C-alpha cells in the first residue's frame, strides 16, 4: 500500500489503539515530520565546496593536479595517455564531479602526508587514470587494461563510488580532518 492514507484509513489501520494513543501517535508523527527539513535542488551538487586556489576554476585545478600526478606516475605522457586522461576529465566535468575528486584527493592526501596507511583502492574506481594520477588509487589502469566506463559512465548518471580503506587505528583522525574542514553537516561514514 504505497500511498498516503486518508485520516479515516489511518484510523481504521490502527483501530486496535485507543483514541488517546492514536492521537498521540499522529501528534508525534507530525512533530517528527516538522523537524525534518530536506530540500533537494535538482541539478545542484550536494557536495561541500573545495577551496580552489586563486586563478583556477574547480575543473582547471583538478586538471592541474591530474597532470602533475601523471608526471609522477608515468615516465612519459604519451598521446594515448593524454587522450584517455582528457576523456576522463571531460566525463568528470560534464557530470559535475570535479569537486568530488578534489575533496577525495584532499583527504587521501591528508592521510598519506600524516602517515595514515591508505588502501590501494578497490572496485571500479581502479579503472580511472584520473584517480590513479591523484593517488586516490594505486593500481595503474593502463597497465592492467581497466575500463573507466565501469566506474563512471555519462549514460548512467550516478555519483562516483570510490571505496577507500584507512588504517583502523587512525581512521578517526581522517574523519576528524574531513569533518573540521568541510563541516559536520557535510560528512557521514558509510561502513
Indicate where each model-derived feature is located.
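Phosphodiester-processing cores and adjacent nucleic acid-binding clamps
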Residues: 1-191
Amino acid at each position: 500500500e504505497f500511498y498516503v492514507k486518508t485520516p479515516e484509513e489511518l484510523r481504521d489501520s490502527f483501530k486496535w489503539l485507543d483514541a488517546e494513543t492514536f492521537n498521540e501517535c499522529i501528534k508525534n508523527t507530525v512533530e517528527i515530520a516538522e523537524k525534518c527539513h530536506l530540500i533537494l535542488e535538482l541539478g545542484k551538487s550536494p557536495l561541500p565546496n573545495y577551496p580552489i586556489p586563486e586563478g583556477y576554476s574547480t575543473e582547471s585545478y583538478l586538471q592541474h593536479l591530474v597532470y602533475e600526478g601523471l608526471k609522477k606516475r608515468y615516465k612519459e605522457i604519451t598521446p594515448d595517455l593524454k587522450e584517455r586522461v582528457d576523456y576522463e576529465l571531460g566525463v568528470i566535468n560534464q557530470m559535475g564531479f570535479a569537486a568530488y575528486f578534489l575533496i577525495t584527493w584532499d583527504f587521501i592526501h591528508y592521510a598519506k602526508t600524516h602517515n595514515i596507511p591508505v588502501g590501494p583502492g578497490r572496485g571500479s574506481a581502479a579503472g580511472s587514470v584520473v584517480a590513479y594520477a591523484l593517488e586516490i588509487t594505486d593500481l595503474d589502469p593502463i597497465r592492467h587494461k581497466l575500463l573507466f566506463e565501469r566506474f563512471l559512465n555519462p549514460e548512467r548518471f550516478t555519483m562516483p563510488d570510490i571505496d577507500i580503506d584507512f588504517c583502523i587505528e587512525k581512521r578517526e583522525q581522517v574523519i576528524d580532518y574531513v569533518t573540521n574542514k568541510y563541516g559536520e553537516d557535510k560528512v557521514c561514514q558509510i561502513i
